[in-house]
Amino acid sequence: MVLPTVAIVGRPNVGKSTLFNRIAGERISIVEDVEGVTRDRIYATGEWLNRQFSLIDTGGIDDVDAPFMEQIKHQAQIAMEEADVIVFVVSGKEGVTDADEYVSKILYRTNTPVILAVNKVDNPEMRNDIYDFYSLGLGDPYPVSSVHGIGTGDVLDEIVENLPVEEAEENDDIIRFSLIGRPNVGKSSLINAILGEDRVIASPVAGTTRDAIDTHFTDADGQEFTMIDTAGMRKSGKIYENTEKYSVMRAMRAIDRSDVVLMVINAEEGIREYDKRIAGFAHEAGKGMIIVVNKWDTIDKDNHTVAKWEADIRDQFQFLTYAPIIFVSALTKQRLNKLPDLIKRISESQNKRIPSAVLNDVIMDAIAINPTPTDKGKRLKIFYATQVSVKPPTFVVFVNEEELMHFSYLRFLENQIRAAFTFEGTPIHLIARKRK
């Protein structure tokens, strides 16, 4: 199910990131300490009153070298284009500024609900000063101290009140996949080429997210697919259409709806920071992953080229050791016929369930190979493990003390489970929990 999007907008130093972290709370996933996984948090999942939503800090998307007014204009444009609800953050300490008025005039033209959050109202005496913000013409200002958590509940109430009606669950028998990557890596050509391979019916339909185009098709075996085109990719006339900073949000929306994500890399240009950043989002979201190196026909090759590329990819994407790599050409259709079967296998891995008895046999064998660690004379005891969910496969390991489960031993257990059950192309999550 796709989540509605809430965008946080505002000039620098008004506390957007603090409010972002306060709303996201502990739902922000801990990024692995591996080079290549982004640590800047511009995207997280928020939840309030049993409603989940994607939370975007548009300030983290923008180009810091751009002129000041251009930056905040871009933020507002992104929010108006992509978000279901906009939270416009201003500073109660500084009052209304020219930049606030500039943004408010842009936001005033949108039909998207705008919530005006007056941040840094850190004591009751400051609440009397918020009324100046009525001059922005965006409705009631909400006093907030994101540092202390004061007033954030009122903002969250208003966010939930303005979220679109929840959509019905989508058909789970359909495999949904998306192609993500930098502009000009050949996503459009790959989409057209894939639709020319092993299909029975292909029909473009309006997607469930703003400006997305979904294409449904069925392969020769009767498996239904939905290919999620990056939102807005087929639109024209957008001044920021082919710039990386604006494609970030669109890629994240596509990732959110996908079961399997195809990370497309241009063989002519190699791996860039953007590739690692977006791949990190897909990994943290627990999606199935395939690394697709496109335009393979355009580069000179020898007997060592594939091995060199694979080694470089594994080095740059150390958090994607589970993701298969495939070298393709949208132009010549080289290896494209392998993609549907690969997507199906990864979808099966995402939905795989392991019986507890079989799982615990593997855990006990793993302990025999590598005994549990000790800390200050106390040894970790593993009582049993069980699978609690799929997409991605998630396992809970019940232990005597959670603190004794070092991340390296958890990683060892993950590798043993992978070796036993072949979870191709999908992350798996292991959680240590104290047995009660």
UniProtKB/Swiss-Prot annotation:
One Pfam family it belongs to? KH_dom-like
| SUPFAM superfamilies listed in its UniProt record | P-loop containing nucleoside triphosphate hydrolases
Q: Name one GO biological process term.
A: ribosome biogenesis
Classify the source by domain of life.
Bacteria
> Key word rRNA-binding present in the record?
no
Gene3D superfamilies on file: 3.30.300.20, P-loop containing nucleotide triphosphate hydrolases
Q: Which residues bind GTP 1?
A: 10-17, 57-61, 119-122
Q: Where is the EngA-type G domain?
A: 4-167, 175-351
Q: Which UniProt keywords apply?
A: GTP-binding, Nucleotide-binding, Repeat, Ribosome biogenesis
Q: Where is the KH-like domain?
A: 352-436
**Which molecular function GO terms apply here?**
GTP binding; ribosome binding
Residues reported to bind GTP 2 = 181-188, 229-233, 294-297
**Function of the molecule:** GTPase that plays an essential role in the late steps of ribosome biogenesis.
Q: How does it assemble?
A: Associates with the 50S ribosomal subunit.
According to its UniProt record, which protein family does this protein belong to?
A: Belongs to the TRAFAC class TrmE-Era-EngA-EngB-Septin-like GTPase superfamily. EngA (Der) GTPase family.
PANTHER family reported for this sequence:
GTPASE DER (PTHR43834:SF6)
Q: What HAMAP family does the entry give? A: GTPase_Der
Provide the protein name.
Answer: GTPase Der
Species this chain originates from: Streptococcus pyogenes serotype M28 (strain MGAS6180)
At the highest ranks, the source species' classification is: Bacteria, Bacillati, Bacillota, Bacilli, Lactobacillales
